[in-house]
């Protein structure tokens, strides 16, 4: 991912304020609501029958936190996203058979959730930087598929 020094410092400063549990759960929940076909990977999470059920589901929240913690690790290794996500790419490709397009969708949902939580602080410049990173992470997670 090619970022300017200003973009990197902006990403880091905002990320330090992110509540990984809250934003991770909301991002994954929104993915499952807006793109319901993604629920097939999470049938073992229990009730996903309504938007309210998804957003309140503790397993969705917990897994969202795990996903966002991994994303945070990626932010520490922007120069080696493929290496950072190699094991997760293999897991999602070989064992879970997740459509790699879902990584892009989740990245876009994450940007929306960050914008919702941070309002005016989430400037167009920060959005640009986060869009670059989520695209890079999605590409790294899809790497094993190629």
Swiss-Prot record:
Tissue and organ expression note: Red blood cells.
Binding locations of heme b: 63, 92
Modified residues (S-nitrosocysteine): 93
Every Globin domain range: 2-146
Keywords: Acetylation, Heme, Iron, Metal-binding, Oxygen transport, Phosphoprotein, S-nitrosylation, Transport
One record GO biological process: hydrogen peroxide catabolic process
Residues recorded with modification N6-acetyllysine: 59, 82, 144
InterPro entries tied to this protein: Globin, Globin-like_sf, Globin/Proto, Hemoglobin_b, Hemoglobin_oxygen_transport
Modified-residue entries (N-acetylvaline), positions: 1
Superkingdom of source: Eukaryota
Function statement: Involved in oxygen transport from the lung to the various peripheral tissues.
Homology family: Belongs to the globin family.
Subunit structure: Heterotetramer of two alpha chains and two beta chains.
The protein's name: Hemoglobin subunit beta-1/2
Organism: Physeter macrocephalus (Sperm whale)
């Amino acid at each position: 991912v090619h970022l300017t020094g200003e973009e990197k410092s902006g990403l880091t400063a905002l990320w330090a304020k992110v509540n990984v549990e809250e934003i991770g759960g909301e991002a994954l929940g929104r993915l499952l609501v807006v793109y319901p076909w993604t629920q097939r990977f999470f049938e073992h999470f229990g009730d996903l029958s309504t938007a309210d059920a998804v957003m309140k589901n503790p397993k969705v929240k917990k897994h969202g936190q795990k996903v966002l913690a991994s994303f945070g690790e990626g932010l520490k290794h922007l120069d080696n996203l493929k290496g950072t996500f190699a094991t997760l790419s293999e897991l999602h490709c070989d064992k879970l058979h997740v459509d790699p397009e879902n990584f892009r969708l989740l990245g876009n949902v994450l940007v929306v959730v960050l914008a919702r939580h941070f309002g005016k602080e989430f400037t167009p410049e920060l959005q640009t930087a986060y869009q670059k990173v989520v695209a890079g992470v999605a590409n790294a997670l899809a790497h094993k598929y190629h």
